[in-house]
Amino acid sequence: MSENTTHFGFRTVPEHEKANMVRAVFDSVAGKYDVMNDLMSIGIHRLWKRIAVDLAHVRSGEKVLDLAGGTGDLTALFRKRVGARGFVVLSDINAEMLRRGRDRIIDDGLAESVAYAQIDAEKLPFPHDSFDCISIGFGLRNVTHKDKALNSMYRALKPGGRLIVLEFSEVHNELLRKAYDLYSFKVLPFLGKLVANDAESYRYLAESIRMHPNQEKLKAMMEKAGFERCEYFDLMQGIVAVHRGYKF
């Protein structure tokens, strides 16, 4: 793959086109995003997110940046942990997803001490040492230059700050992997067509999971960006993994 191309699912595309293509996917699925998440995971995604927040060890009064925050699930959980004395930034590169997240936070009565930002994870517009914790949930696989994004996150974290990456990963059990592939490439697009009238976007999401670095590769990328004490926690045999790293 040349330096001017990247992957969009299983397709090879010009680097400069990927962000707009990803944006179009989430423009398409935004209206049914929460419904599809519940349906695709039988609601288990909510448990995964709670585990990720538990591993972040955020405390009252801390500042958190939730990247690719979408409809606000992680932001809501973080806001409850840091309280009104803390501060959470709900961010997403997609305006429609961010709008839905903002509406949800307001409806849940959590708007105090929450801000909103439409930003690119590769170019965070915050000063050095701004946040106690940065999270990115089910979003890093959609980033074109993951190394740039990790470097940007490292810069924006305070010394002692934590990075939490919640993402689909590599399944360890061979039998489960075969069943998961069948579900991902047959059932998932069917559900996307049935519920969201968009099979192609969910086919891309399945492909993007397979193209994402596995647990060890992502851990190495975090270490290369400067993070220390990097580790990961497999959930459901590696269908999902939570990576954690510290800036010291």
Swiss-Prot record:
> What GO biological process terms does the UniProt entry carry, in alphabetical order?
aerobic respiration; menaquinone biosynthetic process; methylation
This enzyme's EC code(s) = 2.1.1.163, 2.1.1.201
- Write down the InterPro entries for this protein, in alphabetical order: SAM-dependent_MTases_sf, UbiE/COQ5_MeTrFase, UbiE/COQ5_MeTrFase_CS
Q: Its Gene Ontology molecular function terms?
A: 2-methoxy-6-polyprenyl-1,4-benzoquinol methyltransferase activity; demethylmenaquinone methyltransferase activity
Positions annotated to bind S-adenosyl-L-methionine: 71, 92, 120-121
Q: Quickly give the catalysed reaction.
A: a 2-demethylmenaquinol + S-adenosyl-L-methionine = a menaquinol + S-adenosyl-L-homocysteine + H(+); a 2-methoxy-6-(all-trans-polyprenyl)benzene-1,4-diol + S-adenosyl-L-methionine = a 5-methoxy-2-methyl-3-(all-trans-polyprenyl)benzene-1,4-diol + S-adenosyl-L-homocysteine + H(+)
Q: Keywords for this entry?
A: Menaquinone biosynthesis, Methyltransferase, S-adenosyl-L-methionine, Transferase, Ubiquinone biosynthesis
Q: In which pathway does it act?
A: Quinol/quinone metabolism; menaquinone biosynthesis; menaquinol from 1,4-dihydroxy-2-naphthoate: step 2/2; Cofactor biosynthesis; ubiquinone biosynthesis
SUPFAM superfamilies reported in the protein's UniProt record: S-adenosyl-L-methionine-dependent methyltransferases (SSF53335)
Q: Domain of life of the organism in this record?
A: Bacteria
Q: Does the keyword Disulfide bond feature in the UniProt annotation?
A: no
Q: Which PANTHER family match?
A: 2-METHOXY-6-POLYPRENYL-1,4-BENZOQUINOL METHYLASE, MITOCHONDRIAL (PTHR43591:SF24), METHYLTRANSFERASE (PTHR43591)
Annotated family: Belongs to the class I-like SAM-binding methyltransferase superfamily. MenG/UbiE family.
Record's function text:
Methyltransferase required for the conversion of demethylmenaquinol (DMKH2) to menaquinol (MKH2) and the conversion of 2-polyprenyl-6-methoxy-1,4-benzoquinol (DDMQH2) to 2-polyprenyl-3-methyl-6-methoxy-1,4-benzoquinol (DMQH2).
Q: How is this protein named in the record?
A: Ubiquinone/menaquinone biosynthesis C-methyltransferase UbiE
The organism of origin for this protein: Methylococcus capsulatus (strain ATCC 33009 / NCIMB 11132 / Bath)
